[in-house]
Design a protein with these regions (language model features):
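An N-terminal assembly and electron-transfer interface module characteristic of large anaerobic redox
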Residues: 1-118
């Protein structure tokens, strides 16, 4: 039971995409390489002054905005990531890396890039 308090700490980190570990790394001047898929070679993104973060969207409510830009036939995960990106939830990321293995995630990443270009 003593170890459960440590598990709670890590569980709380997962409540926000931009958690205290990411904020500390950014304060230390590190570059955040955000990625969308487990097929990305994560060790290669953690070289030098970079650190990697797999994007996720905890506590997502409505997907209305993302569904406007992407069809409702695409998976909820890709739409949730786009919804969170539109809300500004991934502004901590310095770059976005998306694998070419999933058309739905590619579509979400393309919309994120288009949205960022207009900001």
């Amino acid at each position: 039971m003593k170890d459960l308090k440590h598990l709670l700490y890590f569980e709380n980190l997962l409540q926000n995409a931009n958690n205290e570990l990411i904020e500390q790394a950014k304060k230390d001047g590190k570059i955040c390489a955000a990625f969308t898929c487990e097929n990305i070679p994560e060790p290669l993104m953690n070289l030098g002054n970079a650190f990697s973060v797999r994007l996720f969207a905890p506590n997502t409510g409505s997907l209305d905005i993302a569904t406007y830009y992407m069809t409702s036939f695409l998976c909820e995960t890709s739409r949730a990531l786009l919804e969170r990106a539109i809300e500004g939830g991934f502004n901590f990321a310095d770059c976005l890396i998306a694998a070419d293995g999933c058309t739905m995630m590619n579509r979400a990443a393309e919309n994120m890039e288009i949205g960022r270009a207009h900001v």
